[in-house]
Design a protein with these regions (language model features):
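Helix-to-loop junction immediately C-terminal to a conserved catalytic motif
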Residues: 50
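Short coil-to-helix segment of the ABC ATPase nucleotide-binding domain corresponding to the Q-loop/switch region
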Residues: 95-102
Length: 327
């Protein structure tokens, strides 16, 4: 495991209980989206991973080492393998792009000749070689975040922490930054933790996700699993799943989940042909995830109890997830 959080509690001096019994693992090469509403504990959680904050109790293991047991110099060295980017970029306004990236290497005591080549390599990676002499005030928000990404990768980390890294950007720039991060993750084989309140970020970038609410992880799994079968009420809210059958009685109203391999199949048509029922489609949509697409239909079955049951068994036999909706 690249990251292991074990039995984490975080209580501030004012008595606020920010994190409660948090256990979390991140495997090598995974991109984990941590999503929740404001005040849920997301930023506290990510700052614990590199010990910018320390827990009240529990263990923080990164690359197999408990960071809480390290001396200050040992912790500083361990942090070099953990890159981090923030919502507001945190660039030094008096330094140009080249100098901002080089600064991380100077702190780590790289040789000057190696700093030159490394910075050029990083700026090429993020597409900013032609901006190396620009100052932050001359850059757009997306360009500033690209500088921050280059700086975070300076010391060749294997773990990248992103704290609301796209929240200050417009949707087009957000997409370009997520595309960049996805490419960098694959090229460098990084493990990534991405804190966000935007479900679109999780859909576009992540293969794993967890949902945090009031300091607790309420749901954890692959993005595909959670989108297909969300269990917690907060997860359903974040995914935009509401009372999709409106004012209709919930009797015989179901939500059917279609995974990628079933999206192009005429399943509803086959259902009507096979069984003595009609199917009324109430709503439907398709979510495009980074791993595979997932389709949803909310339908009402019009027919006898026996035929409806046979239709449900048929859908289950196909491997589809079917949930009866409640009022």
């Amino acid at each position: 495991m690249v990251v292991e959080l074990k039995n984490i509690e975080k209580i501030y001096e004012n008595g606020f209980h920010a994190l409660k019994g948090v256990n979390l693992e991140l495997k090598k090469g995974d991109i984990l989206g941590v999503i929740g509403y404001s005040g849920a504990g997301k930023s506290t959680l990510i700052r614990l991973i590199n010990c910018l904050e320390r827990p009240s109790s529990g263990e923080v293991l990164v690359n197999g080492v408990n960071l809480l047991n390290l001396k200050p110099k040992e912790l500083q060295k361990a942090r070099q393998k953990i890159g981090m980017i923030f919502q507001h970029f945190n660039l030094l306004s008096a330094k140009n792009v080249f100098e901002n990236v080089a600064f991380a290497l100077e702190i780590a005591r790289w040789e000057k000749t190696k700093i030159q080549s490394r910075v050029h390599e990083l700026l090429e990676l993020v597409g900013l070689e032609d901006k190396m002499h620009f100052y932050p005030k001359q850059l757009s928000g997306g360009q500033k975040q690209r500088v921050a990404i280059a700086r975070s990768l300076a010391n060749c980390p294997n773990l990248l922490l992103c704290d609301e890294a796209t929240s200050a950007l417009d949707s087009k720039t957000t997409h370009s930054i997520l595309t960049l991060l996805s490419g960098i993750q694959k090229k460098l084989d990084l493990s990534v933790v991405f804190i966000t309140h935007e479900i679109e970020v999780v859909k576009e970038l992540c293969n794993q996700m967890c949902v945090i609410s009031s300091g607790e992880i309420v749901e954890r799994g692959s993005v595909e699993e959670i989108f297909a079968n969300p269990k917690h009420a907060v997860t359903k809210e974040l995914l935009g799943i509401k009372n999709e059958h409106g004012d209709q009685k919930s009797q015989d109203v179901y939500r059917i989940v279609f995974l990628g391999e079933h999206l192009d199949e005429p399943i509803i048509s086959n259902l009507i042909k096979r069984f003595k029922i009609d199917v009324s489609i109430i709503s439907g949509n398709i979510e495009e995830l980074t791993t595979k697409d997932i389709g949803y239909l909310v339908v009402r079955f019009l027919g006898s109890v026996a035929e409806t049951q046979r239709a449900l068994e048929y859908l289950n036999a196909l491997g589809l997830q079917v949930e009866k909706l409640k009022d």
